[in-house]
């Protein structure tokens, strides 16, 4: 099958990465022929229904279980032997580069995977390779570029920027045709690393499906309870302990509040224990991971959406959380941490920003919205207008589609995407 763009991501399909799924569908809808590759299959029990809309098959670079290891190992060894025989000087030069830079084990794994991927994308007729993250996937795509001279690009989001080696990231930027970033904060971080290659770094927000995520068709019956919603993986950077602490303060103040948390992750039991120790277990529900349709319905039951994100010691952080955009598109007022890319989305008209890691500040903001229901309604309406104007998925995808047009090349259209 002749294709134009080999699209590589870390895991596919992953429930929490709807932005990757949406981008793939959007590019295919825009007429960009894609061939999907993923380093691994997440093998999650729950799969987004829209995965069925993806036209391209998916090839996995990592073995799919013990029985597949021998096949993957043999094809990987054969691929590297073929690449060495095809151009010994090029191949040994890359090996020397890896040894000289003293890269760790993950780099060797990336190189091994890249050898197999190089022959796969060549056989598929790819003219360009794009990686969906700046760390592992971009490293694999970079090695494909070095092994084959195929042009490549990558997207940088949040964690993948801040946990990467700056020197290695600078080399990947230098050799890339372009780099996409989804927030100004990510753009600034990448351009600082890029130095003289900063012009390659482009600002291209993900966007959200404003038709799927829309306001409730009929008003919900009002009562005295403030319904708070948070959607996201239960991991440290999401700041869930801050949210639980804020709920405890609201309850102590005598306010009627009910909090729903949608998402799964390693902090689930710890958060439940925290809620119990603070005496707010009856006020907090953990629903686990949900498919898109159920998540969209959950926004219709919310008065306020909370994004209590924090920056971790290793630099890991959110960019612009997709759930935040979904809530705003659904016409829900938002309260979020003033950190990373979040302030780029929330204007004073559509939400409240609070200091990260501060349960008291979050509680104060929620108390204000509890006491002023009219303000919640105004903010929700403004939030939807803002997302439609600036973060509509279709418009965002159409902005980057020319970068992947096989007839026009990949560098000239980049000038039409924002650089700041």
Where would I find each of the regions flagged by the language model?
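Acidic donor-binding loop of glycosyltransferase active sites
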Residues: 300-315, 332
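A short, well-ordered alpha-helix in the C-terminal region of glycosyltransferases
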Residues: 283, 361, 368, 375-390, ...
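Acidic anion/phosphate-binding donor-loop and adjacent secondary structure
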Residues: 164-167, 191, 208-224
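Carbohydrate-associated surface elements
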Residues: 185, 207
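Short hydrophobic beta-strand element within catalytic cores of glycosyltransferases
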Residues: 324, 329, 333-336
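Conserved acidic donor-binding segment of nucleotide-sugar-dependent glycosyltransferases
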Residues: 348-359, 368-374
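Nucleotide-activated donor-binding/catalytic signature segment of Leloir-type glycosyltransferases, i.e.
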Residues: 272-293
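A conserved mid-protein helix/loop that constitutes part of the nucleotide-sugar donor-binding site
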Residues: 18, 226, 230-249, 255, ...
């Amino acid at each position: 099958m002749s294709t134009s763009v080999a699209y590589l991501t870390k895991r596919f399909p992953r429930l929490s990465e709807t932005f990757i799924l949406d981008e793939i569908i959007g590019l295919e809808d825009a007429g960009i022929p894609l061939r999907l590759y993923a380093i691994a299959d997440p093998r999650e029990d729950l799969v987004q229904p829209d995965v069925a809309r993806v036209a391209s098959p998916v090839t996995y670079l990592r073995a799919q279980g013990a029985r597949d290891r021998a096949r993957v190992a043999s094809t990987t060894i054969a691929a590297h032997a073929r690449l060495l025989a095809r151009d010994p000087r090029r191949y040994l030069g890359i090996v020397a580069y890896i040894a000289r830079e003293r890269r760790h084990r993950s780099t060797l794994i990336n190189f091994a995977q890249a050898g197999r991927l190089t022959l796969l994308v060549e056989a598929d007729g790819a003219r360009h390779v794009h990686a969906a993250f700046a760390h592992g996937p971009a490293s694999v795509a970079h090695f494909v570029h070095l092994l084959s001279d195929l042009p490549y690009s990558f997207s940088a989001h949040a964690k993948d920027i801040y946990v990467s080696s700056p020197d290695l990231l600078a080399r990947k930027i230098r050799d890339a045709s372009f780099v996409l970033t989804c927030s100004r904060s990510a753009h600034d971080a990448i351009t600082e690393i890029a130095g003289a290659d900063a012009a390659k770094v482009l600002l291209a927000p993900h966007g959200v499906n404003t038709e799927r995520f829309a306001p409730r068709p009929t008003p919900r019956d009002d009562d005295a309870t403030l319904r708070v919603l948070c959607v996201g993986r239960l991991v440290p950077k999401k700041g869930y302990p801050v949210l639980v602490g804020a709920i405890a303060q609201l309850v102590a103040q005598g306010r009627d509040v009910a909090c729903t948390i949608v998402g799964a992750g390693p902090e689930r039991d710890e958060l439940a224990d925290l809620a119990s120790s603070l005496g707010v277990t009856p006020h907090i529900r953990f629903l686990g991971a949900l498919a898109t349709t159920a998540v969209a319905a959950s926004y219709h039951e919310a008065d306020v959406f909370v994004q209590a994100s924090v920056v971790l010691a290793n630099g890991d952080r959110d960019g612009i959380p997709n759930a935040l955009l979904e809530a705003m598109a659904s016409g829900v007022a938002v309260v979020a941490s003033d950190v990373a890319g979040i302030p780029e989305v929330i204007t004073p008209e559509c939400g409240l920003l609070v200091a990260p890691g501060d349960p008291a500040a979050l509680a104060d903001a929620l108390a204000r919205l509890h006491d002023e229901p009219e303000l919640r309604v105004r903010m929700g309406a403004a939030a939807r207008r803002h997302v439609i104007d600036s973060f509509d998925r279709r418009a965002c995808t159409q902005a980057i589609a020319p970068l992947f047009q096989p007839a026009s090349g990949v560098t000239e259209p980049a000038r039409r995407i924002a650089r700041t």
